[in-house]
Amino acid sequence: EIAEKILDDLDAAPPPYPQWVSVAGWSLMGAAVSILLGGDWLMSLLGAVTAALIISINTWMGKKELPYFYHCVVGGYMATVPSALFYSLATRAGTSIVPSQVIATGIVVLLAGLTLVQSLQDGVTGSPVTASGRFFQAILFTGAIIAGVAGGIQVADLLGAGLPPIETQPPTPSYQSAIVRSMGGVFAAAGFALAVYAEIPAIVATAATAFLGGFTYYAVLIPFGSGRLFATTLCAVMVGLAGGLIA
């Protein structure tokens, strides 16, 4: 009964920050993820706008008590249609953007709220039933995002703002500096922590852990010839271990 009362009090407690602060955190995360994906300042700006748009609409849908499945469908749609319109306008203006980076940024923002990592953590810590439920939920919501993106592509084609063919090779990053890309990871992690109403000490710890992983990846492992798969795995283990110890 005591535990149930504590949970009820936590659920009824007001958030520590206003809603616009959370939206700003998501925008910061979207801007930073665009940098990590190789975008420039314009792509970063579009990523921030897209993230804010997705979260604002999802917040409104949450107030209407719509299931989160539909949040993912609409979020995938909103990640695609604006990027197609931005691409069409940029082409007419004589400049260029990479719409796939904007779409990927929106997808990352949506995936950040899923429970895949939590399901794996439950499995590792001996809670297989909860892990199975959360894993199925993550798969279901991922399918909803894919459906939203597919629908957005079809609508963009109908509006005459079709997307370019997908490149088989990722574009050259606009910022090659290991420090800049590491800081992109720092701002992405800190933005997400702020978006989910973490306290200031938790945000600082999140940023420090992200810098440890990002700097190790971009400044140590990759320059010395480590494979991307091994580097990603090692940094993920480092971040997970550091986060667990700090928590």
Residue ranges of each PLM-predicted region?
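Alpha-helical transmembrane segments and their membrane-interface boundaries
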Residues: 2-247
